[in-house]
């Protein structure tokens, strides 16, 4: 899935948290953080801007191993205990849910998928693998992606997100 789809899911999850009163609704901050949390596993894309179609290999998949994020979030939670930061654990929950959903979306990748049991087992899982190989460049990735039905799934996700948020803000 693409950054826009991860962002859409981040917005929907944040709206869920806000609607339940778990996060403040008088500010845009939760939504900005929700989008950031939903895209944080793709931090490796910043390291490999020239090869964004194959960004998972930039950090040797470290940011795309679910176990690594549970370790990071657990460590951050322990460090935060003495500070009693308001909404901290709610935002940590938002981050955890968004990162997990990021991996679910990436399991719908048109090639390789996610190494759910990494770093111990590097076998990648994809529900709908279409490409047997990694594209040679971003242009080739876009070419294949435009032909795949996942594109329409993403467009539907964007439309639903816009409808839900517009209903919320209008």
Give names to the regions the model predicted.
Residues 1-170:
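N-terminal membrane-targeting hydrophobic helices
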């Amino acid at each position: 899935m693409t950054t826009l789809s991860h962002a859409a899911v981040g917005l929907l999850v944040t709206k869920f948290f806000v609607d339940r009163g778990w996060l403040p609704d008088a500010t845009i901050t939760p939504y900005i953080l929700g989008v950031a949390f939903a895209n944080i596993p793709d931090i490796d894309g910043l390291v490999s801007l020239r090869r964004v179609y194959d960004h998972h290999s930039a950090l040797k998949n470290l940011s795309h191993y679910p176990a690594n994020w549970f370790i990071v979030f657990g460590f951050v939670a322990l460090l935060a205990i003495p500070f009693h930061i308001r909404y901290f654990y709610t935002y940590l929950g938002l981050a955890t849910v968004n990162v997990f959903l990021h991996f679910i979306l990436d399991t719908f990748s048109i090639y390789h998928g996610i190494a759910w049991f990494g770093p111990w087992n590097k076998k990648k899982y994809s529900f709908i693998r279409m490409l047997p190989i990694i594209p040679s460049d971003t242009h080739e990735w876009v070419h294949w992606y435009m032909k795949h039905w996942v594109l329409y799934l993403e467009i539907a996700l964007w439309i639903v997100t816009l409808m839900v948020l517009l209903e919320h803000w209008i």
